[in-house]
Amino acid sequence: MKNRLSGIYRDDVPFKPYLTALFTFGMAYGLYKGILDNYLAEVVAMGEFDRGIAEFFREIPGLLLVGVLAIMYRFSAEKIFRIGAVVMLAGMVMLSAVPASRVIVTIAICIYSLGEHIQLGMRNTLGVQYAKPGKSGLSMGKQTSLYDLGTLLGFAVITVAFLILPSGGTMFRLFFAVSSAIIVVGVTASTRMGSGSRNDADKRRFYFRKKFTKYYLLEVTYGARKQVFFTFGPYLLVLHYGAGASVMSLLFAVSAICCSLLSPLVGKLIDRVGYKAVMVSDTLILVVVCFFYGFAEHFFPTNVSFVICCCMYVLDSVISLASMASNVYVQDLSDSPEETRATIATGVSVNHFVTIFVALLGGWVWKITGIETLFTISAVIGLLNSAYAATIKTSKSPAK
């Protein structure tokens, strides 16, 4: 294992504590994600539109990420990574302690999301910077795989716990507290990363450059399509099919296993065939996924359509791994690691510009017109994303 990692990462970077921290943060996220939808539906009593409103506020930190990172422009990527972890911890502690008020719970989710989004930009940046030349795709695949393994462990704990113990507000808060403790472990590991990354030459961590226009627009369409499944996919299973926390965590676990096993392969595929081919082809599968998720119940009995929707959710998670290709695309266009870091961070905020409105409008569309319309729109957005990705001109040949 050590030799395999050494073949991917540069010798002069602290990739071991970085990967350790990612694993623990993944585990904490697994506990959080495994119970969140059921907590909001069963304890906080949020409906379709309420869930969209909560997601709207959860995504706002992503939109503000550029400004947040600009404030920290003097800090290294490693230090920002740690700051994100501390903010995540604050939000998780709040979730474990506050009453089940829609407003207060939404604020806690928003705080956790701020830390999560700060880390997201730095994870992409560090994954590319720490990699040896020509290994960026494999590096992104490895770190995604490790994060998913930690997430899987969190899901497994929730699956077993809610099979044995009764569901309720106290039970949910207990696991939010456990997740907080695990984040503390991750913060401790991240302190060993030091602050070795170079500062941006122009003292900025964000900017818009003409050569990245296609990347920014692709992030908009990808963010919109992703948001539909991330927010409303699981909530459909909870509200419409009555799936409990144990069932949802098991589904998330299966999804995490598939992503963990396949993400390194997707990374290799990006390095071998090129990011453009991967960015274009994933949407063809997405159309099938959206059709069955939105219309399965029209063709099959409820129990069968539930299983089909679960399978489609897992398949969507797998094809979402192709988003790693956009980070390699940015590296291909960039003149320096600093430019890569700034562009990826900006891309996260561009992604969320449309995402927050999809979250808000998605709940309304579901409530007024039905789930079929929502997933039809998602499929159309995906096709637009694929068509635009086909116009990309690559400047480097795929690795042989």
Language-model features: locations:
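Hydrophobic core of transmembrane alpha-helices in multi-pass small-molecule transporters
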Residues: 23, 91, 103-119, 304-321
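Intracellular juxtamembrane helix-capping segments at the cytosolic ends
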Residues: 36, 118-131, 321-335
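C-terminal membrane-cytosol helix-exit motif in multi-pass small-molecule transporters
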Residues: 158, 162, 180-198, 388-392
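Glycine-rich segments within core transmembrane alpha-helices of 12-TM secondary carriers
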Residues: 141-159, 348-358
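Short amphipathic helix-loop junctions that connect adjacent transmembrane helices
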Residues: 34-50, 231-248, 330-332
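Cytoplasmic membrane-interface "Motif A"-like loop-to-helix N-cap segments
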Residues: 73-86, 272-285
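Helix-to-loop junctions at the C-terminal end of transmembrane segments
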Residues: 64-77, 162, 262-275, 366-367
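C-terminal ends and interior cores of transmembrane alpha-helices
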Residues: 86-100, 285-302
